[in-house]
Amino acid sequence: MSYRESSGSFPAPDRTSLPKMFTNGDSRLRHLPPISSPPPPKRYKSESTPGSDAGHSRYYSHSVASDRTRSRQPSSAMDLYTLIDRDPVDKDPRRNARFTSNGSVATQASHASNASQISRSSPIIISDRKIPEKYPNHKENGRMYHGYRKGIYPLPCDEEEQDRLDIFHKLFTVARAEDGLIYAPHPPGSRILDLGCGTGIWSIEVANKFPGSFVVGVDLAPIQPTNTPKNCDFYAPFDFEAPWTMGEDSWDIIHMQMGCGSVASWPSLYRRVFQHLKPGGWFEQVEIDFRPRVEDKDGEPGRAMANWYSTLKHATEATMRPLAHSSNETIRNLQEAGFTEIDHQIVGLPMNPWHPDSHEQKVARWYNLAISESVQPMCLAPFSRVLSWTREQIDRIAFDVKQEAFDKRIKTYNLLHIYQARKPVEE
């Protein structure tokens, strides 16, 4: 294993704690540029930023674009197409719908027009595919939650939550170097599975960027768009912890983003992912470690932020779906599942724009917006269900955490972890 170290202000991890089980991969921490260094060159196609006022997300200006391709009404926050730049050809709202609202399973014949361009080694049969009306959403603490497999996922599925997920998607595309959508190698005509696809924004972006590929997104909540690219389908409600019937050895890429807090057994999930990948296929996982860290050696995270995280960690552990993320455990579990060529990247996410570097300020503005929209919904169900907190108690701690997140004197950051793991090629 090799560890690439560069000059920067983020502290390097303890070498003794770094995993030593890589077959052909490496772990590298992407540091913030030194304070004295000039800003890095522009690396991203999308230069839209949520306002130029660095420090408080409530001052960010949001444009609301009408988008007829979405299954939900335009909201007061960000719209699908204002969050991510798209080619003009992909903005046509007249695409044929690929997601059927009555829950019927798409058949092999429904994709016949794409058969010459997209390789499908086996049919897709989703055993968990049900009629959404059988599982009505339920209201709890003023928010709407999924009805299918009620209670196993701690976050809402309403308009506010959908906007929050889209904001995180934009954050990841900005924070990740070069190609912000996917790092794992993928051949032309790849079959790509997106686990816990949420609003479907990642699946749609990948389908548009790689029109020769075939992308399938699955999720507990049927909140995906009704009109999608022809090479993209969604199946919901679907519980990826339940048995799959989606064809073993049949996917080139399986992707998962922000799964912590929704998985009871990571070893079991990784084994299932391994079974369904083609030999030589790749699994890519993106997670945030929400444990607050500080830039200054002698500094400490804000008390409210530290208390919020430790309490949330305890509450989610009690539900058997912990939010806390461990890179060492993740890499060990991937190896034990059979993966090789494991690669691990670590990216710093400043909580607010305290760093003078222009790119890091851009990342920080998006993360400040994302975290300010996340503090309350992330703890609402765990604190009320597990700890019996009142709504007033939850709102108070959420308010205090947001105040600390907006304070540039507290140089707090979290870590974004990106993994790629390969299923060995059969000899």
UniProtKB/Swiss-Prot annotation:
It is an enzyme of class 2 (transferase). It is found in: Nucleus. The keyword Transport does not apply. Its main location: nucleus. CDD domains: AdoMet_MTases (cd02440). It catalyses: L-methionyl-[protein] + S-adenosyl-L-methionine = S-methyl-L-methionyl-[protein] + S-adenosyl-L-homocysteine. Induction: Expression is negatively regulated by velA. Expression is stimulated by the polyamines 1,3-diaminopropane (1,3-DAP) and spermidine. Residues 116-126 have a biased composition (Low complexity). Keywords: Methyltransferase, Nucleus, S-adenosyl-L-methionine, Sporulation, Transcription, Transcription regulation, Transferase. GO terms for biological process: methylation; sporulation resulting in formation of a cellular spore. Disruption phenotype: Leads to pigmentation and sporulation defects. Drastically reduces expression of the penicillin biosynthetic genes pcbAB, pcbC and penDE. Leads to a severe impairment in conidiophore formation under both light and dark conditions. Decreases the expression of the class V chitinase chiB1. Decreases the expression of the transcription factor atfA. Residues 1-126 are annotated as: Disordered. InterPro entries: SAM-dependent_MTases_sf. GO terms for cellular component: nucleus. Residues 84-95 have a biased composition (Basic and acidic residues). Its EC number is 2.1.1.-. One of its GO terms (molecular function) is methyltransferase activity. Residues 98-115 have a biased composition (Polar residues). Component of the heterotrimeric velvet complex composed of laeA, veA and velB; VeA acting as a bridging protein between laeA and velB. Interacts with velA. Methyltransferase that performs automethylation. No other methyl-accepting substrate has been identified yet. Component of the velvet transcription factor complex that acts as a global regulator for secondary metabolite gene expression. Controls the expression of the penicillin gene cluster. Controls benzylpenicillin production, but is not involved in the biosynthesis of the alkaloid roquefortine C. Positively controls the expression of the class V chitinase chiB1. Positively controls the expression of the transcription factor atfA. Also regulates asexual differentiation. Belongs to the methyltransferase superfamily. LaeA methyltransferase family. This is Secondary metabolism regulator laeA. The gene is laeA.
